[in-house]
């Protein structure tokens, strides 16, 4: 849990957790590699949002996220007593954060929350559970402030070639099983069932081209999430587990950055 997750991978997980918090709006946000023909236009839009965010005062949101490293642990609820001073302060900061977010253009609000959460993680050099709590608090901002994180429909030609391989490997069913076992917290020592699932997962990956393995794992987790098998912080753990599966199986790439 103390391992520092690569920022690129963490940001991807952060987006999935934020999207889960926005489920009431029936929207999903994903990070997918983009092709060169669309990259310049979409990259320009993202850059414009970043520039706008840098000009805005989002200090209340920053303070609200900063509290995450000391106030609670994953899965631990804060005791909310009537008149509790800490709770009143948190609620006030969250409301102030929402007011600040509303000063940002609608299409840039999700990017704003992502940006300040990224900054907290990078500047604070947060590890494991601390970075996860920042992601959870970012999700609270999204749901409480009514921010709509729209789905990105970017495509990559290479994904078309991978689709057939992923289907041939039954959407990496054994990898899904192994990830589910790991997320459920069956302990550091692998059971016989876990060993079998891992071997089956490695067989799936070895039958695929290198450039398709991480895409296959990403789609496997997305499928589990859409079926309700993974929610909240479980999504975070699933991506963390999947990131290291190629290395565990002795195939390339050594790490998936989702």
Swiss-Prot record:
**Segment forming the signal sequence:** 1-24
Q: CDD domains, alphabetically?
A: AAI_SS
Q: Which residues carry this modification: Phosphoserine?
A: 69
Query: Any remaining note in the record?
Result: The allergen Ric c 1 small chain acts as a calmodulin (CaM) antagonist that inhibits CaM-dependent myosin light chain kinase with IC(50)= 0.25 uM.
Q: Which cysteines are joined by disulfide bonds?
A: 49-108, 61-97, 98-145, 110-149, 162-212, 175-201, 202-249, 214-256
Give residue spans, biased composition: Basic and acidic residues: 73-83
InterPro entries registered for this protein in UniProt: Bifun_inhib/LTP/seed_sf, Bifunc_inhib/LTP/seed_store, Napin/2SS/CON
What the protein does comes down to: 2S seed storage proteins.
> Which keywords does this Swiss-Prot/TrEMBL entry list?
Allergen, Cleavage on pair of basic residues, Disulfide bond, Phosphoprotein, Pyrrolidone carboxylic acid, Seed storage protein, Signal, Storage protein
What protein does this entry describe? Answer: 2S seed storage albumin protein
What subunit structure does UniProt give? The 2 mature proteins consist of heterodimers of a small and a large chain; disulfide-linked.
**Molecular functions per Gene Ontology:** nutrient reservoir activity
Family according to the record: Belongs to the 2S seed storage albumins family.
Q: Which organism is it from?
A: Ricinus communis
The region called Disordered is annotated at: 64-87
Q: How is it used?
A: Ric C 3 constitutes the peptidic component of the immunomodulator Inmunoferon.
Give residue ranges for the propeptide.
25-35, 77-86, 154-156, 191-193
Q: Which residues carry this modification: Pyrrolidone carboxylic acid?
A: 87, 194
């Amino acid at each position: 849990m103390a391992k520092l997750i690569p920022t690129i991978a963490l940001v991807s997980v952060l987006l999935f957790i934020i999207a889960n918090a926005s489920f009431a709006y029936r929207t999903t946000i994903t990070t997918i590699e983009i092709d060169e023909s669309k990259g310049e236009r979409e990259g320009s839009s993202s850059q414009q949002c970043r520039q706008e965010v840098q000009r805005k005062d989002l200090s209340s949101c920053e303070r609200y996220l900063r509290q995450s490293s000391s106030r609670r642990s994953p899965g631990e609820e804060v005791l909310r007593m009537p008149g509790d001073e800490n709770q009143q302060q948190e609620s006030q900061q969250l409301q102030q954060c929402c007011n600040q977010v509303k000063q940002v253009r609608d299409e840039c609000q999700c990017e704003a929350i992502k940006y300040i959460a990224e900054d907290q993680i990078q500047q604070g050099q947060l590890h494991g559970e601390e970075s996860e709590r920042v992601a959870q608090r970012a999700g609270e901002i999204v749901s409480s402030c009514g921010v709509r994180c729209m789905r990105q429909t970017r495509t990559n030609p290479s994904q078309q070639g991978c689709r057939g391989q992923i289907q041939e490997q039954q959407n990496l069913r054994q990898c899904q099983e192994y990830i589910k076992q790991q997320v459920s917290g069956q302990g550091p020592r692998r059971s016989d069932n876990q060993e079998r699932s891992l071997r089956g997962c490695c067989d799936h990956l070895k039958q695929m081209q290198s450039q398709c393995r991480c895409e296959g794992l990403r789609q496997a987790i997305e499928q589990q999430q859409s079926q309700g098998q993974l929610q909240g912080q479980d999504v975070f753990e699933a991506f963390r587990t999947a990131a290291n599966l190629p290395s565990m199986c002795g195939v390339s790439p050594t790490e998936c950055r989702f």
